[in-house]
Each structure stands twice: as C-alpha cells, then as structure tokens.
Amino acid sequence: VTRAFEDFRLSDLFLRLSDRNSMPESNEIFVVDVTSIRNRKAIAETIAEVAATSPKVIALDIMFPDDDRSEDNLILMQTLDTIPATIVTASEVSDDNNVLSSFFTPALPQLREGYTNTTMNNTYSKCLRTYTTTVTNEDDTLRSLPLQIALAYQPSLRYEKDAEQLINYSDVHIRKVLPTDISLFADRFKDKIVVIGIASGKEDLHLTPVGDLSGPEIVALSAHTLIHHREITEMPVWLGVVLGFLLTYCFVVTCSYLHIKYEKTDNIRITLSAILVTILLVFINLIVNHFFHYS
C-alpha cells in the first residue's frame, strides 16, 4: 500500500476517470497477437501474411536472441529481407546503454531498430507511465521503438530528443487481431501500422494507470501519442501548491463559517459539510488539470 501511494501521480487519476469503453478505435495502428505461436517459422509466416496486406510499417515487438535453430532463423531472415514495407524491430538498452539486438540485425541493415521502453527505466513493481524518444550513448543517439514507428509512418514528424513523455492512454483503443483473422483486416491494414508481439500473455504484461496492458499495446499507444502530438502535460508544481493552499484555506473558512452560523450543530456535521465543499473544489482542480493535460 505504501509503495502504491509513493508511486501515485495526479495524471493517474485523470486517466482513470477517462472512459476507455467510449474511446474510438484507432484506424492507424493495429496489434497482431502472436502469443499462441511458439516457433520462429510460424512467426515468419505471420509476418509474411501481414506484409501481404500492404501495411506502411510493420513493427516487431519481439526479441530474437541467437540460438541453434538455424533453419527457422534462415526462414525468418529471408522473410524479413523480402518485405517491401518498412520494418522496425525491437532492441533492449541496459542501464549502461549497451544495446541488445535480435540476431538478424547485423545482416539486414535495411531494418530500423528501436529500443523498447517497456524494459527501460521501468520495473514490474512500478506503474509504466512514460516513454522516451531517444537516449544519448556517448556520440550515438538511440531512438526508441515508438519513435522509429512514428518516423517510419510520418517522416516529417517533429520530436524532442532525449525527452520523457507521459503516454496518452485515454485517446484511442488499440484493436488486437489474431493471426487467423489477418485476412479479415486486409483493407484496414493497408498503408497503416501493424505491431506484432505477445499481446495477451503474462510474458509482456505491464502495470499502467489504466490497468494491465501488454507491451505491444503500450508501444502502439506511445507511437500514436507521438504521431498526433497528444502528449499529456502535468500541471506545474507551483500551480499545484497554490491550489493546495486555496483548498486548505477554503476548508478552514467553511468550517469557521458553519460553526459561527450554526452554533448548535455538532462538529461532525460541520466537518462533513466542509468536506463536501472541498470535494467540489477538488473537481475544479481536476478541470484545471484537464486543460493542462491537453495544452
């Protein structure tokens, strides 16, 4: 409980109050869930099937470390090498900024690589709220997976380097598609973004302000936030202090007023009335926060 309170931010309340059931479904970014697929040959076949629908960007939110399965590895590499769409693959960045890439990255220089935010600066015990655009590694600038996706989809995109932004979980809903249903979404995938990853298993599940979400969904929402500049901006600290002072002042004044006007009223009723007024003021505070979130 203590950890939960320590990790709480006002933006969490804002996102929690958003009705996710009424959010529009994104018509630009989709997630293909390959949780049920356990071998690289089958994943390669799924990638090829997605590529046949002519998406603009295919993002692989899966790490492929080197191993002994040479035949499956060769099929996967051949598939990636023949796809005309822009392919973005995931990598991991350690605390000392060393990059862990998939085995095929050196052999396929046409692929774009981006580090995944879900394994960077976050742990399973903390709420995943933010994504980063880039990290600077000595003289090199490494781009994140969401940024690489956004740039592949919208090359003229403007972004801030080395920035950490809140993910907008309240803007759109990301449709998850099973491999068996890819053909049904052929028209919707055309010229759009398709993120392929484990979207329903516990292997890539993360705590967010709106509940548990998979890594591919978080990547998709981060990319959507970047593409449409729907970043959430938290209220400045100084304004929070001012509003906190005003709330406390109004609470004390209300208590004093009720005590003077209704001398026979017990203190419990006075306190409850004052709390009611304070709650109304808190809602005003939330409205102010809303304007800052979308400023």
Stretches found by the model and what they are:
Residues 1-158, 189-266:
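Non-transmembrane functional regions of envelope-associated proteins
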Residues 154-184:
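Substrate-access "cap/lid" subdomains that shape
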Residues 178, 223, 293-295:
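A diffuse structural propensity rather than consistent per-protein peaks
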Residues 256, 263-294:
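Hydrophobic transmembrane alpha-helices
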